[in-house]
């Protein structure tokens, strides 16, 4: 009961902050939020380990004047009609973790990379005539790379891409490509370039002088044009979500819903526990061919999925 009371207090405090989002942009309010969270959680080990760098903006800390990262400016986009505003279709596949482990080991890869490879395979087979490259945005947690602890966001999207015009790709070819791409891109040196590209515009004096409300109005359009224009879709893998054992009996499973995007239209989010992997598709269209093809592909390889949706 004490633990539940603490959680409720945190939720209510978060709602209070949410009412004045602009005020939360102020570092003093942000600091107040995290101090209140620590007070309510007590001696939580994760919070304790994060105390040193909890308010540090690590993007600024690691920004160096290096050459800018080169990315694809215009990716292939799914030719589907968007649903009416307010609709977001979710398809979740609950999969036994052992069956995925067995299959991914056949290719000498991880479960996350195997699922990403299958996603690429489905898109390449379905859109083999795509003129622009098929690009999947994959967020990487930089806190692990730079060995940092912070409450603030610190991630960068990497953008593996495959040119469908080069011909058909086997799953093995895609996995080999991703192994090489990840080995090259997931390094501190490469992320310095990514951080510089992301942060450099924010150092512009003109942009700094623009009032917050105006930024709030135009930033979504800028992000859509300069950011997600270069993605076909997104793939986020949170990995294993660990919960205190005393709470496990109250949980039926997990969901990780990827944020909707008019440009990408369909995204995938993956989260796991010790027994199952939960593959979640977020879809802003009424076309479910990609989701169907994905789970059918796994089923043909002996990987069964329990499918749950919010639209049937």
Q: Each predicted region: which residue ranges?
A:
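Amphipathic alpha-helical recognition patches that constitute DNA-binding helices
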Residues: 6, 32, 36, 50, ...
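Charged, low-complexity, helix/coiled-coil-prone segments
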Residues: 44-47, 54-66, 113-126, 233-245
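Alpha-helical scaffold elements adjacent to nucleotide-binding pockets in ATP/GTP-utilizing enzyme cores
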Residues: 3-6, 10, 177
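Short amphipathic alpha-helices and their capping loops
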Residues: 10-89, 94, 144
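Short loop/turn and capping residues at structural boundaries
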Residues: 8, 115, 309-311
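Acyl activation and transfer enzymes in specialized metabolism, enriched
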Residues: 1-5, 90-128, 279, 288-289
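Alpha-helix initiation and N-capping motif
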Residues: 4, 34, 52, 56, ...
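Acyl-thioester-dependent acyl-group transfer interface
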Residues: 12-25, 92, 101, 124-312
